[in-house]
Amino acid sequence: MSMLFYTLITAFLIGTQAEPHSESNVPAGHTIPQAHWTKLQHSLDTALRRARSAPAAAIAARVAGQTRNITVDPRLFKKRRLRSPRVLFSTQPPPEAADTQDLDFEVGGAAPFNRTHRSKRSSSHPIFHRGEFSVCDSVSVWVGDKTTATDIKGKEVMVLGEVNINNSVFKQYFFETKCRDPNPVDSGCRGIDSKHWNSYCTTTHTFVKALTMDGKQAAWRFIRIDTACVCVLSRKAVRRA
């Protein structure tokens, strides 16, 4: 009987200690009124509805206006893994006729922050081959007005057009190559046996590291740009008599 009595007393004490505290036990000054949470939830819902209903063009324009206020540490460009010969930050436009063999140049006498070091190829060659033509015609230009791009995850992201580096506004340029014409000749690609092959020229892509918008901060992302023009072949069906 005594053992049962002690067991009941112990169970009662444990239940008393485990009982949830009432609001009267909460220290003064730490209670948050329910009206505050209701107002906060209403504000979040309103902001979410506005973000979903805002046109993409308006968002891009707002982001473009904020890029001048984004300051980037120049030491960030010293990391080799972030360098790309097809991405350039410069205060002046690159030359219109860019050389695809040497994308490393100096603008206005000052080297860009993300300049890479590659050996220059000689413009002269001891052997000249006459009558050589590319199967596809391509055009290469520096693009400085890119506002959106597709990242490596297939998501559309905002590209930073301009950034502030050492109190100077640098513009982000991308060296892109694309096909001039999908059919340089009537049969498709140049120099292809049209009797046995179907052919056409198409632009291919690659991913480069670029500065993009991540909320209100700049972030490095892999984005897709046009980088080459290649010939696509498919064998024609053989007609049997």
Curated annotation (Swiss-Prot):
Keywords: Cleavage on pair of basic residues, Disulfide bond, Endosome, Glycoprotein, Growth factor, Lipid-binding, Metalloenzyme inhibitor, Metalloprotease inhibitor, Protease inhibitor, Secreted, Signal. SMART domains: NGF. It holds the Pfam family NGF. GO terms for cellular component: axon; dendrite; endosome lumen; extracellular space; synaptic vesicle. One of its GO terms (molecular function) is nerve growth factor receptor binding. Its main location: secreted. A 1-acyl-sn-glycero-3-phospho-L-serine binds at residue 209. Residues 19-121 form a propeptide. Glycans are attached at residues 69, 114, 166. GO terms for biological process: cell surface receptor protein tyrosine kinase signaling pathway; modulation of chemical synaptic transmission; negative regulation of neuron apoptotic process; nerve development; nerve growth factor signaling pathway; neuron projection morphogenesis. It is found in: Secreted; Endosome lumen. Residues 1-18 form the signal peptide. It comes from the Eukaryota. The keyword Acyltransferase does not apply. A 1-acyl-sn-glycero-3-phospho-(1D-myo-inositol) binds at residues 173, 209. Disulfide bonds join 136-201, 179-229, 189-231. The keyword Secreted applies. Nerve growth factor is important for the development and maintenance of the sympathetic and sensory nervous systems. Extracellular ligand for the NTRK1 and NGFR receptors, activates cellular signaling cascades to regulate neuronal proliferation, differentiation and survival. The immature NGF precursor (proNGF) functions as a ligand for the heterodimeric receptor formed by SORCS2 and NGFR, and activates cellular signaling cascades that lead to inactivation of RAC1 and/or RAC2, reorganization of the actin cytoskeleton and neuronal growth cone collapse. Belongs to the NGF-beta family. Homodimer. The homodimer interacts with a single NTRK1 chain. The homodimer interacts with a single NGFR chain. The NGF dimer interacts with a single SORCS2 chain (via extracellular domain). The NGF precursor (proNGF) binds to a receptor complex formed by SORT1 and NGFR, which leads to NGF endocytosis. Both mature NGF and the immature NGF precursor (proNGF) interact with SORCS2 and with the heterodimer formed by SORCS2 and NGFR (via extracellular domains). The NGF precursor (proNGF) has much higher affinity for SORCS2 than mature NGF. This is Beta-nerve growth factor. The lineage of its organism: Eukaryota, Metazoa, Chordata, Craniata, Vertebrata.
